[in-house]
A protein has these predicted regions:
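Active-site-adjacent helical/loop segments in soluble small-molecule enzymes
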Residues: 47-107
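Short, loop-centered acidic/histidine patches that primarily coordinate divalent metals
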Residues: 87-89, 113-116
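Conserved beta-strand elements of the Class I
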Residues: 109-111
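Glycine-rich phosphate/pyrophosphate-binding loop at beta-loop-alpha junctions
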Residues: 1-51, 114-134
């Protein structure tokens, strides 16, 4: 809605990989541009300035995680039936929770876009190993 209707929402991405900031932001921009083009929509002028990418939740980069991330995965699956994996979605969900706490966000709606990772969730559960855990 932010880009479609010039809303007041914020678009915040959380990098979970070891990619450099510029490369990661280009990936976000490309995805948004492709979506708008495929749907015959026009991006507002200066839309790129609306993207915010947080790099502080990478936990060492791709495939690296710790017990805090595993705990979030367990909690969300037990509470909400939401399968998260330690490589992608679990790390991103943990980062989102940290971001919300650190920025003291209250009384606002948050949309977490789960981008997949279900097979990795089952690998994590079945193996029950520390995998990439720090």
């Amino acid at each position: 809605l932010k880009l479609l209707e010039q809303g007041t929402e914020q678009i915040i991405g959380l990098s979970i990989s070891s990619r450099e900031y510029d490369r990661a932001i280009r990936i976000m921009e490309s995805g948004i541009s492709d979506y708008f083009a495929k749907n015959h929509l026009v991006l507002p002028e200066g839309w790129e300035s609306e993207l915010h990418l947080e790099m502080g939740y990478r936990q060492g980069g791709y495939g690296q995680y710790d017990e805090r991330i595993l705990q979030v995965i367990r909690e969300e699956f037990c509470r909400n039936g939401l399968p998260l994996d330690p490589t992608y979605t679990g790390k991103a969900f943990w980062g989102m929770k940290q971001y919300i706490e650190e920025h003291q966000l209250q009384d606002c709606d948050v949309l977490f876009i789960h981008t997949g990772g279900t097979p990795l969730f089952y690998d994590c559960i079945l193996n029950d190993t520390d995998g990439g855990k720090k």
